[in-house]
Swiss-Prot record:
InterPro entries: Ribosomal_uL4, Ribosomal_uL4-like, Ribosomal_uL4_dom_sf. Gene3D superfamilies: 3.40.1370.10. Transmembrane segments: none annotated. GO terms for molecular function: rRNA binding; structural constituent of ribosome. Part of the 50S ribosomal subunit. This is Large ribosomal subunit protein uL4. One of the primary rRNA binding proteins, this protein initially binds near the 5'-end of the 23S rRNA. It is important during the early stages of 50S assembly. It makes multiple contacts with different domains of the 23S rRNA in the assembled 50S subunit and ribosome. Keywords: Ribonucleoprotein, Ribosomal protein, RNA-binding, rRNA-binding. One of its GO terms (cellular component) is ribosome. Residues 43-101 are annotated as: Disordered. GO terms for biological process: translation.
Length: 215
């Protein structure tokens, strides 16, 4: 599968880039995608929810009234979970929600997400570019020339491009990240995945192999 390579000014360069079928044209594995999305979202949870249980609520521990002779149901102290102001029974406790997948599963999830995008012609390739200073107007003009304005855009850069990143901060529908940082959720959330040539090379090199390299 070949796609046009665009220049920094949004004009076709006349060259094409090949999308490796082992990365961009596989049978997507929906279950692995779900597992990876669940993993990513679990890592984003703070897990700091906390409620006071019976032994932590402030107050006296004395028995409210004698056991027998009042005609009322027997009770203990005021911290009982069944009383107003008492402790919470089985309340929330701080916990770690994180869980992990192995490297092959993470790569398969990203390949599956990229294959969905490629199947719908939602992957574009642009030459590597940098900015001397933040330029939001220039970035929006580029997206208009590429015909992707108004869509949720994931721009994967070959390297850390601080000025390009800063240029996107006032654009709520644009996500600029170095290619090594993008994950399955980033890909799925985007309507269009815009890859710099170097980013495409990195994805092809890393996701097309099962060797132990950073992913």
């Amino acid at each position: 599968m070949d796609v046009e390579i665009y220049q920094e000014d949004g004009v076709e360069s006349g060259e094409t880039a090949a999308l490796d079928p082992t990365v961009f044209d596989i049978e997507p594995n929906d279950h692995i995608i779900w597992l990876d999305v669940k993993r990513i979202q679990a890592h984003q949870r703070q897990g700091t929810s906390k409620t006071k249980e019976r032994g932590e609520v402030r107050g006296s521990g004395r028995k409210l009234y004698r056991q027998k002779g009042t005609g009322n149901a027997r009770v203990g102290d005021a911290q009982s979970p069944i009383r107003r102001g008492g402790g919470r029974a089985h309340g929330a406790r701080p916990r770690d929600y994180a869980h992990d997948l192995n490297q092959k599963e993470k790569r398969l999830a990203r390949r599956s997400a990229l294959s969905y995008k490629a199947a719908n012609d939602n992957i574009q390739v642009i030459e590597n570019f940098s900015l001397d200073r933040p330029d939001t107007r220039g970035l929006t003009d580029l997206f208009e020339l590429l015909g992707v304005e108004g869509q949720d855009i994931l721009l994967a850069t070959a390297e850390v491009e601080r000025e390009v990143y800063l240029s996107s901060q006032n654009l709520p529908d644009v996500n600029v990240q170095e290619v090594q940082s993008i994950n399955t959720v980033d890909i799925l959330d985007a309507d269009v995945v815009l890859l710099q040539e170097g980013a495409l090379d990195w994805l092809t090199d890393v996701l097309s192999t099962d060797e132990a390299v950073p992913a």
